[in-house]
Amino acid sequence: MVENFSEWFHDILEEANITDSRYPIKGMAVWMPYGFQIRKYTTNLIKEVYDRDHEEVLFPLLVPEAELAKEGLHVKGFEDEVYWVTHGGKTQLNEKLALRPTSETSIYPMYSLWIRSHIDLPLKYYQIVNTFRYETKHTRPLIRVREITTFKEAHTAHASKEEADIQVQEHIENYKEIFDTLGIPYTLTKRPEWDKFPGADYTMAFDAIMPDGKTLQIGTIHNLGQTFAKTFDITFEDKDGEHKLVYQTCAGLSDRVIASAIGIHGDEKGLRLPPEISPKQITIIPILFKKGKEEVLAKCEELKKEFEAAGLRVNIDNRDIRPGKKFYDWELKGTPIKLELGPRDLENNKTIAMRRDQLEKIELDLDENLVSNVIRLIDELNENLAESAKEFHTDHIKFASDIDEVRKLIEEGNVVAVNWCGDTDCGEKIEEITGYSVLGIYEELEEAGKKCILSDEDAKYVALIAKTY
């Protein structure tokens, strides 16, 4: 973990060639080549999980104002953040068009055309697109932006409430798989009524604890009930010939998944990337002298082919610069495994390996076991990154029994668990008094007799309170 996280995060995005924030619109950044590769492998992981029981689609970017305005609660939640297109060339449009802030109001009019019968259900589509929100707070690349460039949204329709509830649990399991693969620990809460997705019956949310103690919302899942089905007339004919409204869910992930993987695993030397999303999982660094140069380079190429045959992503850094600069660069960029090979190593049939999480030299034989030994090192690194992150996460959730303790613990960089009655007025009062956010319900209290931290009423839940991004 890094100490001055805000400064570190800003610097590492630039130094590691992830994004460039100098684009002349606030809150919009350029994905640079190395960052774009990280993004590509992250979206590949998301697609691998969602392609199992969803189909990928792609909807237009523009949403007619009339469609956006149909669902009152929904548009109220986004109306201050919408970008509007008012002209086509020099001609003023008859109807304003919104750059999608999210896609419910563009997707669901089409669902009303596509769903006719119970045999059309369940309908499960997802897309990975860019969305736009006029963010007025302090923007931060990948965390708080005006253009979300990697927005995965899944939208499902079902014949019954029970099926929609089951789908919410399936979304939760999908997200757990994605976050677990990346070694990102999380809290899962049911968002309070005042903070749920506009138009939803309820919202479940995943939050990661960043190195500065703030929480970052990294995934949300919404049970929409029949709210949007009523608005957009999404009905089906059941087996008995009766027309009924569908039940719906939606679920979203964004660039924040990448931000959390970068932030949670990084250290003072730079990135420590989970192997799943590292552009290169192995970097081979030839140590070259005039004598034996060709033999070393030939062996590096041979090793590269062997690793690639095993499904690994490999590069050879044969730039004409000092080895020390190469070591520095790949530590900064977080490549999981670095292999050094020089004439003496080749003579001794050895190579020097180094795991990015430990930075200790490991001597390996250049034999038939090399590939399996390196794969073992990658697996050990992956496991260690996850365990270290989990330990930090667990250590930074503390219980408080009074409001003063809540403030103190959060200022010390923790997320705080409290007993809560569940009343909306009480929850909003907690936020007002502390200046921090009630993330939501962490778990239900099974034993009676415990009192709410504020109202002194019987507590029903354990809630989490945090400083948030």
From Swiss-Prot:
Protein's cellular compartments: Cytoplasm
An individual GO BP term: prolyl-tRNA aminoacylation
Any one GO MF annotation of this record: ATP binding
Reactions catalysed according to its record: tRNA(Pro) + L-proline + ATP = L-prolyl-tRNA(Pro) + AMP + diphosphate
Chief subcellular location: cytoplasm
Enzyme class: ligase
Entry keywords, A to Z: Aminoacyl-tRNA synthetase, ATP-binding, Cytoplasm, Ligase, Nucleotide-binding, Protein biosynthesis
Family annotation (PROSITE patterns): AA_TRNA_LIGASE_II (PS50862)
Signal peptide positions on this chain: none
GO annotation, cellular component aspect: aminoacyl-tRNA synthetase multienzyme complex; cytoplasm
InterPro entries, per the entry: aa-tRNA-synt_IIb, aa-tRNA-synth_II, aa-tRNA-synth_II/BPL/LPL, Anticodon-bd, Anticodon-bd_dom_sf, Pro-tRNA-ligase_IIa, Pro-tRNA-ligase_IIa_arc-type, Pro-tRNA_ligase_II_C
E.C. numbers: 6.1.1.15
UniProt domain comment: Consists of three domains: the N-terminal catalytic domain, the anticodon-binding domain and the C-terminal extension.
Homology family: Belongs to the class-II aminoacyl-tRNA synthetase family. ProS type 3 subfamily.
Assembly mode: Homodimer.
Role noted for this protein: Catalyzes the attachment of proline to tRNA(Pro) in a two-step reaction: proline is first activated by ATP to form Pro-AMP and then transferred to the acceptor end of tRNA(Pro).
Identification of the protein by name: Proline--tRNA ligase
Gene encoding the protein: proS
